[in-house]
Amino acid sequence: MNYTLSKRLCLTAMLTLAAVVYTTSAFAETSKLVIESGDSAQSRQEAAMEKEQWNDTRSLRQKVNTRAEKEWDKADAAFDNRDKCEQSANINAYWEPNTLRCLDRRTGRVITP
């Protein structure tokens, strides 16, 4: 009986020691988690700076878009004019690809098909 009691005491001591070691390691591994609303002074300042930069580049973006649109319109108009020139009833009309104009073979002047 004495042998069983010593076994139980030893087992209890080992479990207690294991529990202490486990809890101290658990305390050592915890970290602090802070959840912010995202409304700090730094984030507001960064947002204001990004908005200012976006507004400053707005005119440049509009100019680039306008230029691209004009170039596309010019190419589209030239394509339509080429079709009209090639389908023209005028035998002397030909399409000049370098100048994107319909010209008269005899005179070299611009004609409207």
Curated annotation (Swiss-Prot):
Keywords per UniProt: Signal
InterPro entries, per database record: DUF1283
Protein name as catalogued: UPF0482 protein YnfB
Domain of life (superkingdom): Bacteria
Family affiliation: Belongs to the UPF0482 family.
Keyword Signal: yes
Entry coiled-coil feature ranges: none
Signal peptide segment: 1-28
